[in-house]
Amino acid sequence: MQDFPRIPLAVLSTPIQKLENISRLLNTNVYIKRDDLTGIGPGGNKVRKLEFLLADAKRKGAEVVFTTGGAQSNHAMLTAACAKKLGMEPILILKKRGVTERKGNQLLEYLMDTDVRFMDTDSYDDIYAEMDRVGKAFAGLVKMAREGQFKPTNNVLYLYSGSAGGLFAIDIELN
């Protein structure tokens, strides 16, 4: 892992804590890794992957991060928090199903002034198609920029949902 670019975002390492009550109830030792103490939003293990993904994006010049998830996605909220901490602009394209009012992660995204867009679908394929559409529109702007018809202001990183870690980036290198 030392060979990969990383920007420390989390307070690490987080403790492992014995859960006394459930250990007693189950008559066995039960422990929990306290990744709620990473120091970013409500925490979670996703901050660890974002340290690498966003470091790579910053190295490549990305200024905007797209990602997706459910209406209350921890991945999306933590991506927004980490991106904001690094001076990047997060854009979340979320499923409209579920809690979409300002509760939980939606409230945190609102407080961070995050650009949140809802799609009325249960299908990630539909959301990825929308991300692809936006990406192709962006690629059209890249072509126009290369032809001297348009000067882009941002590089964009598209970060797919959840813990899968799938990633693709559009890098622009213009003279």
Task: Specify the residue positions occupied by each region the protein language model found.
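PLP-dependent amino-acid enzyme catalytic core
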Residues: 1-175
